[in-house]
Amino acid sequence: MRWYVSIGAVLVAGVLAGGDVAGVAAPSPQNQFSSQLSSFAPGRQSADKEATPSVDVELILAVDVSYSMDMDELAIQREGYAQAIVSREFLQALKSGPNGKIAVTYFEWAASSDQKIIIPWRVIDGPETADAVANEIMKTPIRRASRTSISGAINFAMPLFDENPYRGLRRVIDISGDGPNNNGGPVVVARDAAIEKGIVINGLPIMVKEPSYSTMDIDNLDFYYEDCVIGGPGAFVVTIKDREKFKEAIRTKLLLEVAGRTPERPVVPAVAASKEPRVSCLIGEKIWQDRWGR
């Protein structure tokens, strides 16, 4: 089941002490070559399992840097992630897991062929490693790029899980953005491919500006994220509608993801899979075609 949560609906105490634990996505199966090796060496699979560093979650932070984001928003977004990672609440949530550590990578995205890894896979297991990741996020120059391809971000993220040396109880892609997909393949195709791999996708739709006909903004970006972007056991959306609560929203979402919990007080359940989405999942492509004819 997928849920939407507004800022303030989740308190730190609830994240750490209350609510039901989200469904755990099974780790991706070993590749065919590894499976063949294990069939010839019965002890190999067990040995590999013990040798692989275990973490509570493999977390990919996929951050929109398209031109629809203004420079202030990009700066606040960066600061929000950096401050959340070093916050007392985050570090406390980190220690609540069975392994007391997570693996995280952070990349920025725009068009379907435009993704840039800012933080390669790192383990966060306490204040020192959290500080190192936060500092690395902040020291990288802010950039902007054209087009918005959520599908491209998901497709770029999926193989990153298989390339990292860690083994998590959950695999989560955390997508933030301020507009619908308008480039690359359909977002639902990418989303469904991720779900099939046991990956959970959570969303952070940014709605701090009034939609304008001259832009790619849409009125119900939160519905779009709920119905077209997020998916997997316990998937949820945290919507930002107030610039002043930008950083709070990021911290709330990261706390939930690290603690492996769904929001305590879900506000609006996502539309059932058998029903039509409340917003067309191709609305971004349609707007682009109507305005620019390509």
Residue ranges and their predicted role:
Residues 23-60, 66-75, 195:
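Acidic, polar low-complexity linker/tail segments
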Residues 53-118, 129-176, 203-216, 220, ...:
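Von Willebrand factor
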Residues 62-72, 104, 120-121, 136-147, ...:
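Second-shell loop/turn segments in exported
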Residues 64, 157, 169-183, 194, ...:
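DG-centered beta-turn motif at the end of beta-strands
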Residues 94, 179-227:
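VWA/integrin I-like adhesion module and closely mimicked acidic/polar interface patches used
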Residues 97-136, 213-226:
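Short beta-strand-loop
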Residues 238-294:
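C-terminal "exit" segments of structured domains
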